[in-house]
Amino acid sequence: MVRRLLISLIRAEARRGRNQILPEAAFTGDPRIDEEGLGFDSLARLDLIGAVRDFFDLSRTGIEDYVYVEPTLQGWIDRIMQHFDLLAARSETAQAVFRTSGSTGTPKPIPHPWPKLMREAASMARDQGLVPAPGGAVIGLVPAHHLFGCLFTALLPELAGAALRDLTAAPPASALRTAQPGDLIIATPHLWAHLGAAGAFPPGLRGVSSGAPMPDALWHSLLAAGLEDLTEVYGASETGGIGLRRAPGAAFTLLPFLSRSADDGISDGPAPLPLQDRLRWTGPVRFVIEGRLDQALQVGGVNVRLGHVKSVLEAEPGVEALALRLGGDRLKAFVVCAADAEAGLEARLRARAEAGLDAPARPQHYRFGRALPLTREGKARDWD
């Protein structure tokens, strides 16, 4: 588990710092974590140690000082295990610290105690049967240092005694070329769309999706392409998993260790969960999602705050009003501009988005008009 999580953090820092994708072969044996080994110079190595410290909460024991002098991957793993042992000796609970997937500002740290993460992964395996068939493997397309990936590609394979094939550094379609009957594919809707576009699925494959809503049309197309079944897990970085469903258009079923509270929220024991969405209950443990509470959309598994995107784009001279919606799996924008401002405005908006917004928050399609699209009742509506 620790090795899988550590490799995921290393890959993320390599991509963030120098836009390099480290293949699986780079981690064969016990590679050195330096410039000659995995390509981290002294400054990049410090940044990586900081990311590892924050995720594993190493400051509680001070073990990051010892990680700094360890030259190899296995040395880092040993020190992280020592951190866990020190906390256990003090009767303290270890935790992983995830980050919200927000596209604006600094992502918030969200600590999750390891026992609760293990409980959720065990429930997914034991209660929900989300494990590979005997002899099958978990095929991971999502990073393990994100909550969804941690649960399903780090903890669940270990609990189920299943092999893991980590394809986060490979094209999504490679999952179909290497898959065997009984395998379980872990991916976000954005990645599932790429898998669906790659052709027919080999027989006997099952899947799990999370990180963003799974569109019904995509779900139907995956089943038509030969995917045996798909389970969508609903949750958030702030809460962990909350519910799941096994058919498009169905209500979600609350996970068994959670409960509906008196105010129609959700509780984990006595603690209310900080829900990100409005829920409508259709039964004692079944609910449907009716939209975000914070005016955010999920684009490629990343929370995009529409208010921030609007404020960035509306600052462009000539923009009088602007509306944002999902168009497929990316944002689209409808722009009302001054009569003499449309020429060149799209190029300027794209440049402003490139400079001021993360990739998921940048609209891919722009449309211009004299007024924002409204229904007869004066409510905002979609556009082609």
Curated annotation (Swiss-Prot):
EC number from the UniProt entry: 6.2.1.12
UniProt-listed InterPro entries: 4_coum_CoA_lig, AMP-bd_C, AMP-bd_C_sf, AMP-binding_CS, AMP-dep_synth/lig_dom, ANL_N_sf, ATP-dep_AMP-bd_enzyme
BP GO terms, sorted: phenylpropanoid metabolic process
Keywords tagged on the record: ATP-binding, Ligase, Nucleotide-binding, Phenylpropanoid metabolism
The reaction(s) this protein catalyses: (E)-4-coumarate + ATP + CoA = (E)-4-coumaroyl-CoA + AMP + diphosphate
Enzyme class, UniProt record, top EC level: ligase
Domain of life of the source: Bacteria
Any one GO MF annotation of this record: 4-coumarate-CoA ligase activity
Pfam families: AMP-binding, AMP-binding_C
Tagged with keyword Iron: no
Family named by the database record: Belongs to the ATP-dependent AMP-binding enzyme family.
Job of this protein: Converts p-coumaric acid into p-coumaryl CoA. This is necessary for the activation of the photoactive yellow protein (PYP) chromophore.
Name of the protein: 4-coumarate--CoA ligase
Lineage: Bacteria, Pseudomonadati, Pseudomonadota, Alphaproteobacteria, Rhodobacterales
Gene name of this polypeptide: pcl
